[in-house]
Regions:
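Short histidine/acidic/glycine/proline-rich micro-motifs that form metal-
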Residues: 36-39, 168-171, 202-205, 259
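Short Gly/Ser/Thr- and Asp/Glu-enriched loop/turn motifs at secondary-structure junctions
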Residues: 91-92, 313-315
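Conserved core segment of the aminotransferase class I/II
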Residues: 47, 220-290
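N-terminal basic, amphipathic alpha-helical segments
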Residues: 1-52, 258-265, 273-276, 282-294, ...
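A generic "structured core" feature
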Residues: 122-132, 159, 195, 255, ...
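Conserved acidic functional residues
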Residues: 1, 198-202
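Conserved core of the PLP fold type I
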Residues: 51-54, 61-192, 203-204, 210-218, ...
Length: 315
């Protein structure tokens, strides 16, 4: 059927109107979100140099579909870095690269035992329970104490998978003690369907004490799944995260997920591999740690000089 000219004109006029946005960004006077970085401290000149090197040395690799586990050069660079920085002796073959922790979590959930109950730290990073809720997974809150995740709370729950952040808990800042880490590993070894998801986010930024080796490095029973991201150590816009799977889970992943395309940019993966290999990444971390330490000390001085906040327990 035909449409009359007046109706067409009305349709065009309607289409030309600006629709209301479906989502509006909030505007804040001060931003205290915990996952931000100091964008001005991003190593722009070094990153540009690295990108130019990658663009000049690689051709088809940058535009072809990447390996579904991630670019091999980056997986090897990450494995070497984890050995130096976290005491982890892992094979690049057990590392999976993805564009975000959320993406990797989606893949991980499909590998874990069916009918699993997930445990999340309370208080803790709210995004983790939201992921469980998004997939309709049962989860329990696991209380914290001064040593880390409460073993009593964990045992009282029906959880067989627990998500922990032993190196730097958010928001309490607790560092899980070596003894509690051993207790967690013993708990995981007691049943075949138990796993620990170690979220090592922010592990690079320890100022007053020496880092404890990663929980994964202490695991003799292959029950720890290690996850981390470069969003805090570099920038949120560099969408590269990774997980280290126990070999048994990795075999399942290869068998079941090899048809997936890798979600991270190949060009950025090659650039990050080079950035880690030539030492630029660790030098950048050293500069960031110095800056954050100084800023933290300055903030504490200001708080202690102020009468607005009791300072007797601030450290």
């Amino acid at each position: 059927c035909s449409v009359s000219a007046p109706e067409r004109t009305a349709d065009r006029n309607f289409a030309s109107e600006d629709p209301e946005p479906l989502y509006k960004e909030d505007t804040w006077y001060a931003d205290f979100t915990s996952n931000n970085t100091i964008y001005e401290k991003f190593p722009f000149s070094l990153w540009r140099k690295t990108m130019r090197e990658v663009l000049s040395e690689y051709d088809l690799e940058l535009v072809q579909r990447a390996h579904f586990l991630g670019v091999p050069a980056l997986r090897k660079a990450i494995a070497d870095y984890l050995y130096r920085s976290r005491g982890m002796n892992v094979s690049p073959e057990c590392i999976v690269i993805g564009a975000s922790i959320e993406y990797l979590y989606e893949k991980l959930i499909k590998l874990l035992p069916e009918n699993s109950v997930y445990g999340a730290e309370n208080p803790g990073y709210r995004k983790i329970p939201r992921i469980y809720e998004e997939f309709g997974l049962p989860w329990k809150s696991i209380e914290m104490d001064e040593s880390g995740v409460s073993m009593a709370s964990l045992r009282e729950s029906s959880a067989n998978i627990v998500h922990v952040s032993p190196e730097h808990h958010y928001p309490l800042g607790t560092v899980t003690t070596a003894g509690r880490r051993q207790e967690l590993l013993s708990w995981a070894a007691e049943a075949a369907d138990r796993y620990i998801i170690e979220d090592d986010y922010d592990c690079e930024f320890r100022y007053s004490t020496k880092s404890i080796p990663a929980l994964q490095s202490m695991d003799l029973n292959h029950r720890v799944i290690y996850m981390n991201t470069f969003s805090k150590s570099l920038a949120p816009a560099i969408r590269i995260s990774y997980m280290v799977l126990p070999r048994k889970l990795m075999e399942h992943y290869i068998a079941r997920a090899n048809f997936y395309s890798n979600s991270a940019s190949s060009c950025e993966q090659y650039a990050l591999a080079r950035f880690i290999e030539n030492g630029s990444f660790e030098r950048h971390l050293s500069r960031l740690k110095k800056y954050y330490r100084q800023e933290g000390e300055r903030l504490l001085r200001i708080i202690k000089q102020s009468s607005l906040i009791p300072s007797s327990r601030i450290t």
